Amino acid sequence: MCIRDRLACARGGWGSARLLERSIPWKPGWLLGFSDITSLLWSRLKAGLAGGIHGPLLTTLGAEPAWSQERLRQLLFGETPPALKGEPRGGGQTTGPLIAANLTVASHLLGSDHVPELQGAILILEDVGEAPYRIDRMLTHWRLCGALQQLGGIGFGQFEGCDRNLDDLLTTTLEAVLDERTADLNIPVVKNLPVGHICGNAALPLSLIHI
């Protein structure tokens, strides 16, 4: 009998990357979480296992709207949820492995052995509480690593609180940073997806999707 993992994370925060210093015996099944859980989702995906779901935590699931809870149920039971709606910039359509992540956590995984294959992938990013200049710094790091240039498509979820508490270091807006750092990639880009640190955090399967 094959014992399958069915892991739903209670909360995010910090520290999940420390677990990657150990050899995690991933098994088939599914893993649910987001934010700091990006580290575990990516490690599992790099190990060649499907079933990762970037979605609500146990501590936030009860506050999710009905459509979000139903979407998660559909994914857990092998049903196909409806397509998400965002704001496309430019045109085009692409198909590739779907990867979702918190931008800050994923940025600190670059260069490690826990980064899934990015070539041709569709990457969905979200974050919370990071000033636009920090978002710019991280996306520039991705570009310097050649990571953004490998993608087949990119989607931006919610960057909650990332345009608040503006200070003297702010010389641009979040919107301008996201546009400028992806403008020359010549791939489909979608913004304002209902994904991230919001009530209405749409679950995403780490699988195939069109944008």
Question: What feature does the model see in each segment?
Answer:
Residues 23-43, 51-57:
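Short, acidic/small-residue loops that bind anionic groups at enzyme active sites
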Residues 1-5, 209-211:
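Conserved small/polar residues in nucleotide/adenosyl-binding loops
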Residues 158, 162-208:
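ATP/nucleoside-binding phosphotransfer catalytic cores, i.e., glycine-rich phosphate-binding loops
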Residues 11-14, 130, 159-160, 195:
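Short glycine-rich anion-binding loops that position phosphate/pyrophosphate groups of nucleotides
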Residues 50-107, 111:
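Conserved anion/nucleotide-ligand pocket segment
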Residues 117-174:
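Internal helical hairpin/lid segments
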Residues 26-30, 49-50, 151-152, 184-187:
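A short helix->loop->beta-strand "cap" motif at the edges of active sites that frequently abuts
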Residues 4-18, 23:
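Active-site-proximal cofactor/substrate-binding loop regions of enzyme domains
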